């Protein structure tokens, strides 16, 4: 049986964690990015399909390639973030299933149904983006996930000639708490959940 994590860990991962829009000028090392992936990859996905592919943008050149795709409200926070992750999904993720899910012919489930393949890739890469956020928080980093961008521009700028398609962006770094907005409410259990 698993042990519950400490109240402090729950605060770090959930109740005290915030979406950041401003960043301290503290770099995020490539080794830390590897640690993030080393944690997030263990999050469950359907048939272990693991469709997410991540591009960590760390350079000014990379940010300039990304700039035209950003909405005005996301521009400054992204250009000043130490790292921006493009979380994409591989439209041919099923080609790795003989390795990732050797228990049966899972590849054929998706090659026979392009719609199922796309739905599975998008849904599961979205889950993996959430795992990335939790991994960042566990390592003492802050994040700012965003969907306000031109996906086609990102795909053209970063994924031309590949099987990858962008899902969302996540800014990563050490947040400047002085630039946080007031904490917004969340729905109560009664508003969001049901018991049957």
Swiss-Prot record:
The keyword Lipid metabolism does not apply. Induction: Up-regulated by the nitrogen regulatory protein C (NtrC also called GlnG) and repressed by RutR. Pfam families: Nitroreductase. It is an enzyme of class 1 (oxidoreductase). Keywords: Flavoprotein, FMN, NAD, NADP, Oxidoreductase. InterPro entries: Nitroreductase, Nitroreductase-like, Nitroreductase_HadB/RutE, RutE-like. SUPFAM superfamilies: FMN-dependent nitroreductase-like (SSF55469). One of its GO terms (biological process) is nitrogen utilization. GO terms for molecular function: 3-hydroxypropionate dehydrogenase (NADP+) activity. Gene3D superfamilies: NADH Oxidase. The keyword Flavoprotein applies. It catalyses: 3-hydroxypropanoate + NADP(+) = 3-oxopropanoate + NADPH + H(+). Its cofactor is FMN. Signal peptide: none annotated. Its EC number is 1.1.1.298. PANTHER family: MALONIC SEMIALDEHYDE REDUCTASE RUTE-RELATED (PTHR43543:SF1). HAMAP family: Oxidoreductase_RutE_HadB (MF_01204). Belongs to the nitroreductase family. HadB/RutE subfamily. May reduce toxic product malonic semialdehyde to 3-hydroxypropionic acid, which is excreted. This is Probable malonic semialdehyde reductase RutE. The gene is rutE.
């Amino acid at each position: 049986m698993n042990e519950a994590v400490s109240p402090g860990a729950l605060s770090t991962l959930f109740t005290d964690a915030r979406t950041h829009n401003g960043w301290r000028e503290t770099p995020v090392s490539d080794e830390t990015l590897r640690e993030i992936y080393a944690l997030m990859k263990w999050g469950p996905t359907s048939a272990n399909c693991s469709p997410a592919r991540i591009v960590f943008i760390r350079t000014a050149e990379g940010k300039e390639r990304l700039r035209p795709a950003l909405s005005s409200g996301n521009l400054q926070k992204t250009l000043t973030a130490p790292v921006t992750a493009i979380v994409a999904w591989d439209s041919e993720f099923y080609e790795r299933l003989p390795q990732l899910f050797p228990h049966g012919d899972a590849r054929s489930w998706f090659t026979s149904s392009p719609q199922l393949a796309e739905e599975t890739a998008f849904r599961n890469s979205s889950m993996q983006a959430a795992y990335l956020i939790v991994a960042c928080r566990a390592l003492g980093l802050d994040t700012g996930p965003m969907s306000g961008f031109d996906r086609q521009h990102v795909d053209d700028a970063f994924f031309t000639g590949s099987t990858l398609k962008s899902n969302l962006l996540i800014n990563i770094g050490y947040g400047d708490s002085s630039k946080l907005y007031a904490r917004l409410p969340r729905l109560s259990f009664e508003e969001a959940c049901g018991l049957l």
